[in-house]
From Swiss-Prot:
Similarity comment: family membership: Belongs to the iron/manganese superoxide dismutase family.
Organism: Mycobacterium simiae (Mycobacterium habana)
Main location: cytoplasm
Coiled coil: none
Cofactor binding note: Binds 1 Mn(2+) ion per subunit.
MF terms (GO), sorted A to Z: metal ion binding; superoxide dismutase activity
Name assigned to this protein: Superoxide dismutase [Mn]
A single Gene Ontology CC term: cytoplasm
Annotated EC: 1.15.1.1
Length: 18
């Protein structure tokens, strides 16, 4: 995925905001 937020430990394009 392209949008990765390491501070939250999630992958936006894979997991989504929810």
């Amino acid at each position: 995925a392209e949008y990765t937020l390491p501070d939250l430990g999630w992958d936006y394009a894979a997991s989504g905001p929810g």
